[in-house]
Each structure stands twice: as structure tokens, then as C-alpha cells.
Amino acid sequence: MSEKNAYAKSGVDVEAGYEVVERIKKHVARTERAGVMGVLGGFGGMFDLSKTGVKEPVLVSGTDGVGTKLMLAIKYDKHDTIGQDCVAMCVNDIIAAGAEPLYFLDYIATGKNNPVKLEEVVSGVAEGCVQAGVALIGGETAEMPGMYGEDDYDLAGFAVGVAEKSQIIDGSKVKEGDILLGLASSGIHSNGYSLVRRVFADYTGKELLPELEGKQLKDVLLEPTRIYVKAALPLIKEELVNGIGHITGGGFIENVPRMFADDLAAEIDEDKVPVLPIFKALEKYGDIKHEEMFEIFNMGVGLMLAVSPENVNRVKELLDEPVYEIGRIIKKADASVVIK
């Protein structure tokens, strides 16, 4: 018995792994950017930081996954957008620190290598990288029979960006009177899906719920997370924002206070929040308390900016999209987030 046959009998298909690598090369090539060194398949990804032109570089890193949204991708057998979610979760955190994301690495673990499915996943990763302007410089696909079911997989990512030291955004510049501007989310993004799956557990995904304006439920649930890099970078370069909040798990209540010091608070005008139809549907069909929705979901705002009043018009001018003035920074009395 050859070693290859012995390994195959244990559930690991080496040939399928090689096929995955060949299939994804064209997708990786789409993400090329200045600074990338080496070739796909090396032991380590390399990036020449001098190509960024940053004078005092500070590296900023982020890692994340997409949680149980993956279970819906598997349930509905749609795998070409979940990779974008993974990229978004990492690069949006990096941009919140005032850094430009540079490169990305992915990790896929599965019970059985399915080259077609894994190519779809990586195509989504590559699309996310293109949208974020980052290079996909490496990754790992691990076939782990016994750890995962044959149709199951997990996906995680790691991104690195660079900030000019003087432009780091850490909340220290946010002050009382700053205006809170919201940029729209594309949907649920990648958080709260354990609750989402419970609410819609008995649905096929093909339903046309009246709240969803003609879209099938599964398409709304799998709408990929928006990537904010290209919207936010010009604002950072011009030093127009004092704070940035990526609204992820924990919704407004947990993420907004991460933007500023402990002696400040955010006052949110609920009427100005562009609540998306899916959140109204979740509240209705899940019998979720209205105030709890803001503790779980982004409610239609995926990125929040704290901006000095005199810079608001310039920010709106640079952003080629609707911008929502949803609140302001106040002195903290009790709660860190006050929704009125």
C-alpha cells in the first residue's frame, strides 16, 4: 500500500487539494497591487512596505471570521459571496484605526475538499480584496475529516494595513459636539446570525416576505457585508474624521462607545437611522424587543464617523452616497449610548 493511498483512506484527498490551488490562481491574480513580492505557494507572503510611501508607518492588523452566516451559505448552497464577508470583517476594523489595508490571508478548514465549492469561496475572498484594494498574498486550506462534516467548512481571515503615525484614529480626538454621521450597511452584514437562523429556522429561503420588497429571503440573508475602505480612505487622508466605528456584533450599544473616551457618550436620533427592511422583519417575526435590536444589529448603519461640525460638509462632498446625520457626541451622564 502506498503512502498516498493510506492518506486517501484516512479521508484526505491530496489531489483535490492540488486542484483547489490551481483553480484559485486566477482569482488571486485579480488582487495584485504595488508592494506584493514573491509568488503564490511560497512558505510566507511578502509585502514591500516602502511601496506605500508612508513616512512614519504603523502596522495595524485584524482577524475575523463570518460566524454562523456560514451555515446559511451551506444550507442554501451559495458560496461565492461569503468570502467577501470575511474580507470585510477584517478590513473594516483596520480602516476604523485610520489605516489603509494592504494585504489579506485566508484560512479555510473543511471535512472534504470540494474544489468547485472552495473555488467559489475564494472567488468571493478575491472580490472582497479587489473592493478593499488589498492583495491576497497567502492562505491555507485544511482538509480535516472527522473534525468537520463532509459538506461543512469554516472560514477566517487576517489582514494587515498601514497608518501614518500622525493619522492614527484611536478615539482621542473625538470631542463633545462632534457630529455622528452614518454610512449605510448593505444588510445584516456578518453578526447576529445565531439569532437570525433561529428566527427563520422553518423557512426555505425562497419566501417573498412583504417587508423585503420583492427579494427572496435567502438573498437578503446572504447579502455580503459592505466594504468601506474606498469610502473612508479619502476622509482619513484629509484628516476629516475624529473617530470611526465599525458596527458589528453588539450593534450600536457595544461598538459606538469604542469610538471615544469614557467621559463622552453618543446621543442617537433614532428617526434618522436608515433602518433596513430586514431589521423590521427580524423584529416582527422574531418577536424581538425594539431596544434589543440596537444591541445586536447594525440597523442599517455599518460605519459611523465622528466629525467636527465644520468638516461635515466636506465629508459629505467626498462621499458619493447618502450620509446620515444620526446624532452627536455629548458629555457622559450615565449610558455611553443614548437613543432618543
UniProtKB/Swiss-Prot annotation:
Upper classification of the organism: Bacteria, Bacillati, Bacillota, Bacilli, Lactobacillales
The keyword Cytoplasm appears for this protein: yes
Matching NCBIfam families: purM (TIGR00878)
SUPFAM superfamilies: PurM C-terminal domain-like, PurM N-terminal domain-like
GO biological process: 'de novo' IMP biosynthetic process; adenine biosynthetic process
Coiled coil: none
Cellular localisation: Cytoplasm
Disulphide connectivity of cysteines: none
One annotated GO molecular function: ATP binding
Pathway it works in: Purine metabolism; IMP biosynthesis via de novo pathway; 5-amino-1-(5-phospho-D-ribosyl)imidazole from N(2)-formyl-N(1)-(5-phospho-D-ribosyl)glycinamide: step 2/2
Name of the featured protein: Phosphoribosylformylglycinamidine cyclo-ligase
Reaction(s) this enzyme catalyzes, per UniProt: 2-formamido-N(1)-(5-O-phospho-beta-D-ribosyl)acetamidine + ATP = 5-amino-1-(5-phospho-beta-D-ribosyl)imidazole + ADP + phosphate + H(+)
GO cellular component: cytosol
Enzyme class: ligase
Keywords assigned by UniProt, alphabetized: ATP-binding, Cytoplasm, Ligase, Nucleotide-binding, Purine biosynthesis
Similarity annotation: Belongs to the AIR synthase family.
Statement: the UniProt record of this protein carries the keyword Chaperone: no
EC number: 6.3.3.1
